């Protein structure tokens, strides 16, 4: 089965049924790609913390019923570990920070899922993003001053500050530059903009080095991720959010994503708890009703003051009408 089916493509698939492992390879004139998938059975030594709620501590029940309940509510943790790599040449016209490269796509994930048994495939609901290793290699001689900036962002996030997963700045004067980003979060396979979750932005500063149409560098990236049936299936190693290989320390540096400062605001407890709210996931309809809130907010006090002023004006208008009518 071809990973990226195209014309004039040489592809290879090898499978080790004993080890529950599959390797997909594809190569053509545009580049090379390879994918590795390993089932959870081969990685039982990886420790996982599960979210559990023991029925026996909630309900008082006979032993026989307790055993039946355990069987009824047991859930198998389905995990498929994947490593995907791809290589492509970049036109200097496209290396100016104006375009993005999606490092993981819905199409790729669907191809991974298509190799699973139907009963397992239908349970898969999450993708966990573990690590992204990026290698840039120049397509010109060594010794040319060619600064480059790279950022990996979650482009679903609207804030340009909060969308940053990691950034690196280096130079291709020595021919190559490499770094690793660790996103370490999971997302639903049903999220609308899945292809924008891992977006690579690159800015090649020496824009006059070549003309449009010339390939200035090669980007090779490797993404390690896991497909699971639960958001609670995966634990991540305690790595930094971004790392620069030791050999590149002198010619580059990295910038980690910022962790917010949480403000302990004890005054703001306003939350809408009105009745007749829409069901989560259902199509919303406009409703007119009373808004009941926990806590006092500035907006609610302002509304009360406005109502008082309106009431006063109505009383004044009423008195004026009485005077005009001679009452």
Curated annotation (Swiss-Prot):
A single cellular component GO annotation: host cell plasmodesma
Keyword check for Transport: yes
Alphabetical GO biological process terms: transport of virus in host, cell to cell
Pfam families xref list: MP (PF01107)
Subcellular location(s) of the protein: Host cell junction, Host plasmodesma
Stretches assigned to coiled coil: 297-327
Ranges that cross the membrane: none
Principal location class: host cell
Keyword vocabulary terms for this entry: Coiled coil, Host cell junction, Host-virus interaction, Transport, Viral movement protein
Protein task: Transports viral genome to neighboring plant cells directly through plasmosdesmata, without any budding. The movement protein allows efficient cell to cell propagation, by bypassing the host cell wall barrier. Acts by forming tubules structures that increase the size exclusion limit (SEL) of plasmodesmata, thereby allowing viral ribonucleocapsids to spread directly to neighboring cells.
Quaternary structure and interacting proteins, as annotated: Homotrimer, through the coiled-coil domain. Interacts with VAP. May interact (via N-terminus) with host prenylated Rab acceptor protein 1D (PRA1D).
Recorded family membership: Belongs to the caulimoviridae movement protein family.
Protein name, as recorded: Movement protein
Organism, as annotated: Cauliflower mosaic virus (strain BBC)
């Amino acid at each position: 089965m071809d990973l990226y089916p195209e014309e004039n493509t040489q592809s290879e698939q090898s499978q080790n049924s004993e080890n529950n492992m599959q390797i997909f390879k594809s190569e053509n004139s545009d580049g090379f790609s390879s994918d590795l998938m390993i089932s959870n059975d081969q990685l039982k030594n990886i420790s996982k913390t599960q979210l559990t709620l023991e029925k026996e501590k909630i309900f008082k029940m006979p032993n026989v019923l307790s055993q039946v309940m355990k069987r009824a509510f047991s859930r198998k943790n389905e995990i498929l570990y994947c490593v995907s790599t791809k290589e492509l040449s970049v036109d200097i016209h496209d290396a100016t920070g104006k375009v993005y490269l999606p490092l993981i796509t819905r199409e790729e994930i669907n191809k991974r899922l298509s190799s699973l048994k139907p009963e397992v495939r239908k349970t898969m609901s999450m993708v966990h993003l573990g690590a992204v290793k990026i290698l840039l290699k120049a397509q010109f001689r060594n010794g040319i001053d060619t600064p480059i900036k790279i950022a990996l962002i979650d482009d679903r996030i609207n804030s340009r500050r909060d969308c940053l997963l990691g950034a690196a700045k280096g130079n291709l004067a020595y021919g190559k530059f490499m770094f690793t980003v660790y996103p370490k979060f999971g997302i639903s396979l049903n999220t609308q903009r899945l292809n924008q979750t891992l977006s690579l932005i690159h800015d090649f500063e020496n824009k006059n080095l070549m003309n449009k149409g010339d390939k200035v560098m090669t980007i090779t990236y490797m993404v390690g991720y896991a497909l699971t049936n639960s958001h609670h299936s995966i634990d991540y190693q305690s790595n930094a959010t971004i790392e620069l290989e030791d050999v590149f320390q002198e010619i580059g540096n990295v910038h980690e994503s910022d962790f917010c400062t949480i403000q302990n605001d004890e005054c703001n407890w306003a939350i809408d708890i009105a009745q007749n709210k829409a069901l989560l996931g259902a199509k919303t309809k406009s409703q007119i009703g009373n808004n009941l809130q926990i806590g006092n907010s500035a907006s609610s006090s302002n509304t009360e003051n406005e109502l008082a002023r309106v009431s006063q004006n109505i009383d004044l208008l009423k008195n004026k009408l009485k005077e005009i009518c001679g009452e």
